[in-house]
From Swiss-Prot:
Positions with a binding annotation for Zn(2+): 312, 316, 327
Any GO molecular function: metalloendopeptidase activity
PANTHER family, per database record: NEUTRAL PROTEASE 2-RELATED, PTHR37016
Family: Belongs to the peptidase M35 family.
Name of protein: Neutral protease 2 homolog TRV_03208
Gene3D superfamilies in alphabetical order: 2.60.40.2970, Collagenase (Catalytic Domain)
GO biological process: proteolysis
Function: Secreted metalloproteinase that allows assimilation of proteinaceous substrates. Shows high activities on basic nuclear substrates such as histone and protamine. May be involved in virulence.
Glycosylation: residue positions: 221
Group of enzyme by EC: hydrolase
UniProt organism field: Trichophyton verrucosum (strain HKI 0517)
């Protein structure tokens, strides 16, 4: 592990000034500002009633939350046997920069908004009997009338029990039935990859392979860095994080990977803010137009780029990480505020941890102008 002596000295001098508040854990942040109530709405239909219990308006961003309009995971679904229903939807990574007003929902104090969805469209309800549903997460919040994320409000719903007839549930059209009905061999010819995209994708995979490999080694030794991103210092956590990053590194290749890395949006699910998305049920990753517009590596602190996106999406695949990682929190502040168990299940924690070798540069550029130096500091 390398450090530049001069940088270490400067870092020591600046440490008191740069001390950042430790993000509050999500348990400590539950203040009932936002409540979510799940109610049955007909066989496999669910109505989520989201209420602002606070005294101020909430400006809520819906990405990867109970309010998301995409066929994403909104609730956890468990059969009475204890088995979790397989998720058949998409896990998208959204662009969180330059957000616009239309992406937010304004919720005045004591007001509610309802969101209706059918769990059968994205879950395999193959068993008859009782299913238990619950939603838990955090919704990014901007200032009222603004679009800059300043905080998150946490929610934890009631548990909803539903009696489901598997035969009837199977009659509900699933979100990606048309696409999944084709074999992988038939889907691949539709994946048009021009020379530039082929080059950029391979470069992103190779970059992610190297970065994840280095991060896996760092996780075994850098206790404080592991604590920063995964909220635990014990050897078991360091080993688990290291193993997951090693698996992501091995999967980051177009040749012989357990993940199919596509060049195009075959299913047609790229929205204007979607960078890429994964089908965990198929171990497939699809990039969106935004992916190609991003830098290979972003030289700004904790910002999104192609290499980090490959690591993030790699963590979503069950052939790489078991159980696969979900989207429980986006961005540095939210990801580092998760509990240890949830941080280890969150894709962004692995991407942020792996890309954090740029952290020294991120801190120093606040105080020192270094226009001609691009610093990469290993953990």
């Amino acid at each position: 592990m390398k450090f530049f002596t001069a940088l270490a000295a400067v870092g020591a001098l600046l440490a008191p000034a740069l001390a950042l508040p430790t993000p509050a854990s999500e348990e400590a942040s539950h203040n009932q500002t936002l409540s979510v109530r799940l109610v049955p709405a007909g066989h496999t239909m669910v109505r989520a009633i989201v209420t602002n219990n606070g005294e101020r308006p909430l400006h809520l961003l819906s990405f990867n939350t109970i309010l998301d309009e995409d066929p994403t995971s909104k609730v956890e679904v468990f059969h009475e046997s204890g088995d979790e229903a397989e998720f058949l939807g998409m896990l998208p990574r959204y662009d969180l920069s330059d957000l616009t007003e239309d992406l937010f929902t304004r919720l005045a104090p004591k007001d509610s908004v309802e969101h209706l969805f059918d769990i059968a469209t994205v879950h395999d309800l193959k068993w008859d009997g009782k299913y238990t549903l619950a939603a838990r997460g955090a919704i990014p919040v901007a200032e009222d009338g603004g679009t800059t994320i300043i905080d998150h409000v946490y929610y934890e719903s009631n548990e909803l029990d539903m009696e489901i007839d598997a035969r009837k549930a199977a009659m509900v059209p699933r979100a990606f039935d048309d696409y999944f009905s084709k074999s992988l061999d038939k889907r691949r010819p539709l994946d048009i990859c021009n020379p530039r995209k082929e080059r950029d994708l391979r470069a992103a995979l190779e970059g992610a392979q190297q970065v994840a490999k280095e991060a896996a080694a760092a996780a075994q030794n850098n206790t404080e860095k592991v604590f920063e991103f995964f909220r635990a210092r014990d050897p078991g956590t360091r080993k688990e994080v290291s193993q997951h990053l090693s698996s992501i590194s091995r999967a980051a290749t177009k040749d012989g990977s357990s993940v199919t890395w596509f060049c195009s949006d075959g299913p047609g699910r790229c929205g204007p803010r979607t960078i890429a998305y994964t089908f965990p049920a198929k171990n497939e990753v699809h990039p969106c137009p935004l992916f190609w517009q991003m830098p290979h590596v972003n030289n700004k602190c904790h910002r999104q780029d192609r290499v980090g996106t490959v690591i993030h999406e790699g963590a979503h695949n069950p052939s790489v990480v078991t159980p696969y990682c979900k989207d429980l929190g986006y961005g540095y502040n939210r990801a580092t505020g998760l509990t240890s168990q949830r941080a280890k299940r969150n894709a962004d924690n692995y991407a942020l941890f792996a890309m954090a070798r740029q952290l020294v540069f991120c801190l120093l550029h606040l105080f020192v102008a270094l226009p001609f130096i691009y610093i990469f500091a290993s953990f």
